[in-house]
């Protein structure tokens, strides 16, 4: 049986997308100078939060969505050799539509 991470409430598990390795002019950016990625792929999402009336508020994102998130939001999680971010829904700023 495969082990998975299932976010609770209005939390979202995101796999950050790699930052650019080179500049537009072709210069290689060292790891120490790279910005933290702010874009990632939704791996899984919780069922949504429960409002004051006891109604579950559905999530705005779903598995597979590419999202832009707050630069300093979330908790870094390392699982099975992969790095993820566990974000609150409010830390997700936009969904990238292609």
Swiss-Prot record:
Signal sequence bounds: none
Subcellular location field: Cytoplasm
Region (Disordered): 35-57
Location, primary (coarse class): cytoplasm
Single GO term (MF): ATP binding
Pfam families tied to this protein: Cpn10
UniProtKB keywords: Chaperone, Cytoplasm
Highest taxon of the lineage: Bacteria
GO BP field: chaperone cofactor-dependent protein refolding
Role summary: Together with the chaperonin GroEL, plays an essential role in assisting protein folding. The GroEL-GroES system forms a nano-cage that allows encapsulation of the non-native substrate proteins and provides a physical environment optimized to promote and accelerate protein folding. GroES binds to the apical surface of the GroEL ring, thereby capping the opening of the GroEL channel.
Family: Belongs to the GroES chaperonin family.
SUBUNIT field: Heptamer of 7 subunits arranged in a ring. Interacts with the chaperonin GroEL.
Protein name as it appears in the record: Co-chaperonin GroES
Gene this protein is translated from: groES
